[in-house]
Amino acid sequence: MALVQAHRARRLHAEAPDSGDQPPRRRVRQQPTRAAPAPARARRRRAPAPSPGGSGAPPTSGGSPASPLLDASSKDTPAAHRPPRGTVVAPRGCGLLQAIDAATNQPLEIRYHLDLARALTRLCEVNLQELPPDLTPRELQTMDSSHLRDVVIKLRPPRADIWTLGSRGVVVRSTVTPLEQPDGQGQAAEVEDHQPNPPGEGLKFPLCFLVRGRQVNLVQDVQPVHRCQYCARFYKSQHECSARRRDFYFHHINSHSSNWWREIQFFPIGSHPRTERLFVTYDVETYTWMGAFGKQLVPFMLVMKFGGDEPLVTAARDLAANLGWDRWEQDPLTFYCITPEKMAIGRQFRTFRDHLQMLMARDLWSSFVASNPHLADWALSEHGLSSPEELTYEELKKLPSIKGIPRFLELYIVGHNINGFDEIVLAAQVINNRSEVPGPFRITRNFMPRAGKILFNDVTFALPNPRSKKRTDFLLWEQGGCDDTDFKYQYLKVMVRDTFALTHTSLRKAAQAYALPVEKGCCAYQAVNQFYMLGSYRSEADGFPIQEYWKDREEFVLNRELWKKKGQDKYDIIKETLDYCALDVQVTAELVNKLRDSYASFVRDAVGLTDASFNVFQRPTISSNSHAIFRQIVFRAEQPARSNLGPDLLAPSHELYDYVRASIRGGRCYPTYLGILREPLYVYDICGMYASALTHPMPWGPPLNPYERALAARAWQQALDLQGCKIDYFDARLLPGVFTVDADPPDETQLDPLPPFCSRKGGRLCWTNERLRGEVATSVDLVTLHNRGWRVHLVPDERTTVFPEWRCVAREYVQLNIAAKERADRDKNQTLRSIAKLLSNALYGSFATKLDNKKIVFSDQMDAATLKGITAGQVNIKSSSFLETDNLSAEVMPAFQREYSPQQLALADSDAEESEDERAPTPFYSPPSGTPGHVAYTYKPITFLDAEEGDMCLHTLERVDPLVDNDRYPSHLASFVLAWTRAFVSEWSEFLYEEDRGTPLEDRPLKSVYGDTDSLFVTERGHRLMETRGKKRIKKHGGNLVFDPERPELTWLVECETVCGACGADAYSPESVFLAPKLYALKSLHCPSCGASSKGKLRAKGHAAEGLDYDTMVKCYLADAQGEDRQRFSTSRTSLKRTLASAQPGAHPFTVTQTTLTRTLRPWKDMTLARLDEHRLLPYSESRPNPRNEEICWIEMP
């Protein structure tokens, strides 16, 4: 027989016996009851004796009641009065809270009573005291935390401790001491022992309360406990924590580390298969106008061509005709506008773009209204609006039963190299999203200038998608496809795209790379510029521009012959410019179609994503497209069945983002020889260095928690302490990671000119042989340093990251591109080869993308979240810029003249609000001509700008929190890619310098003179060593470019870049000159096999290379070496200064000014190496320290 608590009465009833067994799945588990605490223990109330019938209810007159199963009247018995069945579960009297004391950071275990009134009453009974008469148990039962102090004052204990539970398990202790009573009442009369205290006297024992939100509990006891630092479990003596719990705590609970790694968001690479697209391809021609801010470039001609889906093309063509655009005679879909008037081109193009996006937006709105005929009645009944267009988006999405098939429209404004020039010139006119689109659209804008270019300028007009829902089956996503349910909105997107960002070359070279027809000839733009600036240009008798306007004599003759073939008597410079510009637009439009088809075919065939409707223009750059393909390949391989890439490939964020970025170190670029070198020189280049590095193992999996991380770090330190024993890069016992290290170099006779690591401690990146302190390095770098003889010590750092395993995560991506490139070479498919080469080289750059906390917005683009962040002090406005008013369309009111009488002028100083005389004469009137006593004032013209103040102001916003939130790029992969490239160069240095170990640096022969990121300039001795010791790394002798996990070893190849053009053998330069990094020249190339000679090579970064030659660079070096200060060498080139948003005075937003840059040509002055003699340079070392290093660090001497 079991006892159960009655529903309301404070008594227990006996349960009727039940002979049947309870089903196992419904059996109630009995919890052991805890003994009452000693201070609060009281006598239990015992249940009355059970009745003979076994029921707790009074027996009926008929004797024992019948069984409910047999008595039909029992169906009418209320459920509350039926005999309860089951096992008794006594309610818990106490709760347990484990928390951290905010004052001492001590873990605590707080045991508290769940029933405040009952516990406080029993506590008073145990201590032979009573509650104050004005404090009833009912008041205690309904009390919340706001009345706790009033209750304490009524109780008047000696002391009351209040533990308040805060966020994340932290408790704060406060002590309340009740005020003393007035005189005569503070002293209580003595009472006999074991007698209750007299009424009105305070309690004689302290109290302790726990506040959880608004709930108050009486604390039984507070005990200090221990807390595991790895899993956060509280324990008294010992405990066991699992690796899973440690990982969960580290990644999700710990307030310090839970935001260090973020899951990378994912969406399929393909676009919606029903997307309707319209492409407006355009180009502009400009002339130079001397404005208030220098030589500004003003457009005088704009040509555009339409392409895409036929219905949208037809609508755009008709709109252009209706707006007065001229049609080019050679193509019905090409229109143009020519006018030298400043701002006219931009105004007309803005009008067309506004009308076009308004036309497409209304088309989308019409289809939405047609699919929802109840919209008008609902808007009238619910909001009192006569037209649905007066609804807002927030109101529209509440429309019940939204129906229809969603539509997706995309408008692309495309050009070649427009983001760095054309769009900036036109931006002040065309950047506008205030078109008269219907009100229910949700309008968002993505505007991002970067490095002087407009990277994004996209506007989205969105409506609710009735078919949107959360995806649960991800099979379609694994194949790169998507459908109606994956989009929250149906939309019209207006996007600006630059084909230069997808080809990284000029339009002429891009046309050749993608097998497009290219027209011969070019235009004399200098003559056109002079024509618009001065009204004329120098020409021959037939009007053809003279030779000085062309690049050289050859270009002049070619273009003159091409024009003569047209049979025209007089050269029309404007018409010729129009034809050249229109032909450029035709080539760009063909390039757009070629890129769309070629990339879609590549993704479908080479990558194997047959369900992906890939559109390369959906993303603005080749880097973003390569990263999207990589994410899609990873998602297909891992099948995470979620909207991210899963827990195995994460992105470093917050503190870890800066920590990982510190391990990303740039390439090697410096000469170890300055001056003229008169001995054979060969140039070797690593074949696809970043592609080969990407195929090597990368860190994989969620980073280890601190406990497992410490074990992995100890294994690394034990391996590093074994001096003289080389570590295998692919030792499975050593896990990948990023560490903070100290490293000491070996003896200087064991060093060489190719250090294994570089440092920024001196403010500039230096490849140095000095000791390293506090550097952030990958585990690959640890092996490289150790194998080169360095002593490496791991510095304890809570940010140290160790991953659970290696994985060739990017190998499949690189293999696809290499296979496509080889297939393109066999099939002579230049387009496929260009795509594969670009994608192969772009992935590393996407990993290394640097994020910041800044963004640039227009005043009218700041949403509610941004404004809230500014008011809360979380976002600062770093600078504000205003658009140049000359670039805005304006209306000018002409000058006018008004006359005033003396009486009217007397009102000039009066307050308008003081005059209530409605019969007073108006101050403006036109008196008869020649009226005496009147004064005439002539008002200057007034300019009314056609723009809102929000359209004219750009704000640069920056978050106050300097930590970067990253959920897009796995930046640590970039660290390991660069680390593998350093391992390649380290092995290369072994081929050249291992035989010199033990010989002083000054006594060693010259083997290399210049090192670039992926190349090395070697002498004849170095060339022989490459052909012998490094033979397996030379491509012509065979070898692999892709890492093989079955046979793990460093995989990289080089080839000689200086080859003979006649026989293909390795050639050398007999004489060379080196002035500075990226400033050198090879006089010529000589082939030792066939004796042929060819043109050398010249590199002059930042200089106009066409104005330099080998002899000039030799003269420059000799003049500097001989101290001839009077003789100066320089180069000049025309540069375009682009300003998008700047706080600098004189730099106005959205302007392009033309300037002439003059740069002095001279040898390297601010060197990052130490001089060994007149020509030779060496990396810094302990005997030749870096003079820039001023950082102080603690070093313990042995």
From Swiss-Prot:
Cellular localisation: Host nucleus
EC number: 2.7.7.7
Keywords per UniProt: DNA replication, DNA-binding, DNA-directed DNA polymerase, Host nucleus, Nucleotidyltransferase, Transferase, Viral DNA replication
A GO MF term: 3'-5' exonuclease activity
Comp. bias (Low complexity): 30-40, 57-68
Reactions performed catalytically: DNA(n) + a 2'-deoxyribonucleoside 5'-triphosphate = DNA(n+1) + diphosphate
GO cellular component: host cell nucleus
GO biological process: DNA-templated DNA replication; viral DNA genome replication
Annotated region (Disordered), positions in chain: 1-87, 179-199, 904-930
InterPro entries per UniProt: DNA-dir_DNA_pol_B (IPR006172), DNA-dir_DNA_pol_B_adenovir (IPR014382), DNA-dir_DNA_pol_B_CS (IPR017964), DNA-dir_DNA_pol_B_mt/vir (IPR004868), DNA/RNA_pol_sf (IPR043502), RNaseH-like_sf (IPR012337)
Top-level lineage group: Viruses
SMART domains the UniProt entry points to: POLBc
Top-level EC class: transferase
Similarity comment text for this entry: Belongs to the DNA polymerase type-B family.
Subunit description: Heterodimer with the terminal protein; this heterodimer binds to bp 9 to 18 of the genome. Forms a complex with viral pTP, DBP and hosts NFIA and POU2F1/OCT1 for initiation of replication.
Function: Eukaryotic-type DNA polymerase involved in viral genomic replication. DNA synthesis is protein primed, and acts in a strand displacement replication. Assembles in complex with viral pTP, DBP, host NFIA and host POU2F1/OCT1 on viral origin of replication. The polymerase covalently transfers dCMP onto pTP, thereby initiating complementary strand synthesis.
Extra facts: This DNA polymerase requires a protein as a primer.
Name of the protein in question: DNA polymerase
Gene, per the UniProt record: POL
